[in-house]
Amino acid sequence: MRLSISHETTYHYEDQVRASIQYLRLTPHDSERQRVISWQLDLPRPVRAQVDPFGNILHVLTLDEPHDAIIIGARGQVDIDELREAEHESQSAFPFLRSTRLTEADEALRGFAGQHCHQRRDRTALIDLMHALNQTMVYTPGATEVDTCAAKAFAGRAGVCQDHTHAFLACARSLGIPARYVSGYLYSEDTAHLASHAWAEAWLDDAWYSFDVTNQLARPERHLKLAVGLDYLDACPVRGMRRGGGHEQMHAKVFVAPTPVISVQQQ
């Protein structure tokens, strides 16, 4: 499947911002299950790409002139291998056993993981865990903040895809299974207009397997990956800091849709 993506993020500030810096992980890269056909960023000024410690493509946008708005755009086309269930990588999975403030498992999460996985440490066990988390934590926009940790979201029994993913990571790591946060996009036939998405990957049998708690999907057939990390802070598409500006309004618009692949026949 070939997906076309358009993602625009706009920031408006009530006062002039003296300076700002934005960390952008908005560029996908080729892997076993996705191939980038075309991609470009639309930014206020040219920025050189670099690679972060997790292998993500990173752009650092620095604006040192006064401004009251920023518009960040990304668009392109990517082919997705809908049949591939897992991805192999040469990088060690060991770092993804480490917990962070957002993914630390408390006694409740450790007990939940043990209850639903018992002594099993296979894909079936993690699929059961994924379904159990989805039933326990009701998808509720606005129930949590961007810095809400897994334990707090789990205790509140509500959250969004970020919280579902953090809770899954906390549980998997408590079982000794390397797991990582994934940011990207998901195409759904229900609507082409979606927000950016988040899901988890766990290291099993020397490969990374996907677990989308929010949508109860264990096969990434319509997922497009942007970045990975230990948690949201490592992999979120846009994260920044600024001096001045006062109150901020942020609006994100995402469009994801399939695109016909036209084959040219030679005569």
What role is predicted for each listed range?
Residues Y11-I21, T140-A150, A198:
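Short N-terminal helix-initiation segments at or just after the protein's N-terminus
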